[in-house]
Swiss-Prot record:
Pfam family, one: AP2
SMART domains, sorted: AP2, B3
Entry's localization field: Nucleus
Feature: compositional bias, Low complexity: 1-25
Task of the protein: Probably acts as a transcriptional activator. Binds to the GCC-box pathogenesis-related promoter element. May be involved in the regulation of gene expression by stress factors and by components of stress signal transduction pathways. Transcriptional repressor of flowering time on long day plants. Acts directly on FT expression by binding 5'-CAACA-3' and 5'-CACCTG-3 sequences. Functionally redundant with TEM1.
Gene Ontology BP annotations: cellular response to hypoxia; ethylene-activated signaling pathway; negative regulation of DNA-templated transcription
CDD domains in the cross-refs: AP2, B3_DNA
The species this protein was found in: Arabidopsis thaliana (Mouse-ear cress)
Protein name as it appears in the record: AP2/ERF and B3 domain-containing transcription repressor RAV2
Gene3D superfamilies: AP2/ERF domain, DNA-binding pseudobarrel domain
PROSITE patterns: AP2_ERF, B3
Family as reported in the entry's similarity comment: Belongs to the AP2/ERF transcription factor family. RAV subfamily.
Cellular component, GO, one term: nucleus
GO molecular function, a single term: DNA-binding transcription factor activity
Length: 352
C-alpha cells in the first residue's frame, strides 16, 4: 500500500472522529430549554427563550371568588381561616355555590361586616339563625349541604309560632308548639336491630313501609342510585339520608348520614325509631327515637381466671342503677362495671 492511500485513510478517519465528537458535545436544541415559574391556583407558566413568548399550562383553574379552591375532580372546595387554621367547608359542583358557602361561614365567623363574594348574602332572620348556632354546627351544615334546608325549616317554625290564624302575633309559643306536634301523622316505627346500629352503617326499611311511604322515582328500584331524603328531629335539626334499593339483598336502606344519626342519638339495638310526616301542605318528614322499654337482655359473660379469682364483665343494668336520658343522650356511667368473684368465697364484690 503506498503512502497516498495511508494519508487518505488517516484523513477520513480523523474527519469522522471529529464529526462524532462534535455531535456528542453539541448543546441541546433551544426548544428543549424551558424554565417553569409556578403560579397560584395550581397553574404553571412556561417560558420559551427561543421566541420570548410565555405559554401557560393550567392543571387546575383558579377561582375568582374568595375562599374557593379548585379540586382535581373538577369540583370546587370552600374554606375559611380561623386563627391561622384552615376550616374546610365542603366540596361543591359549582364555584358559585362554594362561594356562597364561604360567605355564610364568613358572616358567622366574622360578623355582618365580613368581606364576602356576593352582596346581600344574608336576608332578614338569617343572622339570628347563624348566631343561634355554634360555628361547628354551621360548618357541619355546610359540609352536609343541609344549611338551606335547616334555615328554611327554622323560618317556617318561627313564622308558625309567632302568627296565629288571624295573622296576628301570638305570644304563647307552647300552645303553638302543641299544635305543631298534633299536625303530624306517624308513618311507621321500627325497633333497630344490632346490624342497623352496627358497622354496616345502614338502616333497613321494611319493604311494605318503604314502597308505601318512600317510593323511589324509577319504575324499577334496582336501576336507581338512590335519592336524598330530609328528616327533621324533635330539636329542629335536619338530617339528610341517602335512600336507595340494594339489589343484592333486595332491601330498601338508609345509608349515607345514618351512622352520624346513630352516633349522636346513641342508638342501641332494641331502641325504636319513629318516622312521621306533617299533615300540612309542606309534607315535611320527621324522625324521632325512644329507648326500648324493659330491661336489657343478659349477655353471655366471659370469665377469666387470674390468681384464683374469676374476673368477669358485668354489662347488665341492675334495678338500683339509674340510666339517665337527657336531650336524646343517655348516661353510660353504669354500663361498664367490673366484678370480682373469689373461687373460695362465693361473694361478689363490685369494683368501680
Amino acid at each position: 500500500m503506498d503512502s497516498s492511500c495511508i494519508d487518505e485513510i488517516s484523513s477520513s478517519t480523523s474527519e469522522s472522529f471529529s464529526a462524532t465528537t462534535a455531535k456528542k458535545l453539541s448543546p441541546p436544541p433551544a426548544a428543549a430549554l424551558r424554565l417553569y415559574r409556578m403560579g397560584s391556583g395550581g397553574s404553571s407558566v412556561v417560558l420559551d427563550p427561543e421566541n420570548g413568548l410565555e405559554t401557560e399550562s393550567r392543571k387546575l383553574p383558579s377561582s375568582k371568588y374568595k375562599g374557593v379552591v379548585p379540586q382535581p375532580n373538577g369540583r370546587w372546595g370552600a374554606q375559611i381561616y380561623e386563627k391561622h387554621q384552615r376550616v374546610w367547608l365542603g366540596t361543591f359542583n359549582e364555584q358559585e355555590e362554594a362561594a356562597r358557602s364561604y360567605d355564610i361561614a364568613a358572616c358567622r365567623f366574622r360578623g355582618r361586616d365580613a368581606v364576602v363574594n356576593f352582596k346581600n348574602v344574608l336576608e332578614d332572620g338569617d343572622l339570628a339563625f347563624l348566631e343561634a348556632h355554634s360555628k361547628a354546627e354551621i360548618v357541619d351544615m355546610l359540609r352536609k349541604h343541609t344549611y338551606a334546608d335547616e334555615l328554611e325549616q327554622n323560618n317556617k317554625r318561627q313564622l308558625f309560632l309567632s302568627v296565629d290564624a288571624n295573622g296576628k302575633r301570638n305570644g304563647s309559643s307552647t300552645t303553638q308548639n302543641d299544635k305543631v306536634l298534633k299536625t303530624r301523622e306517624v308513618l311507621f316505627e321500627k325497633a333497630v336491630t344490632p346490624s342497623d346500629v352496627g358497622k354496616l352503617n345502614r338502616l333497613v326499611i321494611p319493604k311494605q313501609h318503604a314502597e308505601k311511604h318512600f317510593p323511589l322515582p324509577s319504575p324499577s328500584p334496582a336501576v336507581t342510585k338512590g335519592v336524598l331524603i330530609n328528616f327533621e328531629d324533635v330539636n329542629g335539626k335536619v338530617w339528610r339520608f341517602r335512600y336507595s334499593y340494594w339489589n343484592s339483598s333486595q332491601s330498601y336502606v338508609l345509608t349515607k348520614g345514618w351512622s352520624r344519626f346513630v352516633k349522636e342519638k346513641n342508638l342501641r339495638a332494641g331502641d325504636v325509631v319513629t318516622f312521621e310526616r306533617s299533615t300540612g301542605l309542606e309534607r315535611q318528614l320527621y324522625i324521632d327515637w325512644k329507648v326500648r322499654s324493659g330491661p336489657r337482655e343478659n349477655p353471655v359473660q366471659v370469665v377469666v381466671r387470674l390468681f384464683g379469682v374469676d374476673i368477669f364483665n358485668v354489662t347488665t343494668v341492675k334495678p338500683n342503677d339509674v340510666v339517665a336520658v337527657c336531650g336524646g343522650k343517655r348516661s353510660r356511667d353504669v354500663d361498664d362495671m367490673f366484678a370480682l368473684r373469689c373461687s373460695k368465697k362465693q361473694a361478689i364484690i363490685n369494683a368501680l
